[in-house]
Amino acid sequence: MTKILKVKLMKIALPIDNNRLSPHFGRCEKFMIVEIENGEIKNKEIIENTARNGMHGVGTTSASLIANMGVNAIIVQNIGPKAYSVFKQLGIDVYKANTTSIDECIKLFLEGKLEKFE
C-alpha cells in the first residue's frame, strides 16, 4: 500500500527596505519571497521592486509583480486600497505586521499570530 503525504506548500511575500519590513508596500526597494513547506522555510529569494519609481499606480503594479510570483500571502505594515483590492481579487491573503523584523514577521505568520487585513 502506498502512503500519500499531504504537503502544504506556499509562498509568502514581504516588502523590504534595508533588510526590514517596509512601511510602504508599493515603494519598497525589494520583496522577499519565502517558500514554506509543511510549516518550515525551504527557500528565500529577494527580487527588486521594479515598479517603485513609477509616477502613478506603483501599488497596483507592485501587487501584480508579486502575484505573478505565485504567492499565497503577503505580510505588510501598510497597504493602499488599490493594491489591497488586487490581492483580494486574486485570492491572495494580506496580513498586517506590527514589527519590522523580517524573521519575527515570518515566525508570527507560521504561528498563525498575524491579523488579516479585511
Swiss-Prot record:
It comes from Methanocaldococcus jannaschii (strain ATCC 43067 / DSM 2661 / JAL-1 / JCM 10045 / NBRC 100440). It comes from the Archaea. This is Uncharacterized protein MJ0580. Pfam families: Nitro_FeMo-Co. Gene3D superfamilies: Dinitrogenase iron-molybdenum cofactor biosynthesis domain. SUPFAM superfamilies: Nitrogenase accessory factor-like (SSF53146). PANTHER family: DINITROGENASE IRON-MOLYBDENUM COFACTOR BIOSYNTHESIS DOMAIN-CONTAINING PROTEIN, IRON-MOLYBDENUM PROTEIN-RELATED-RELATED.
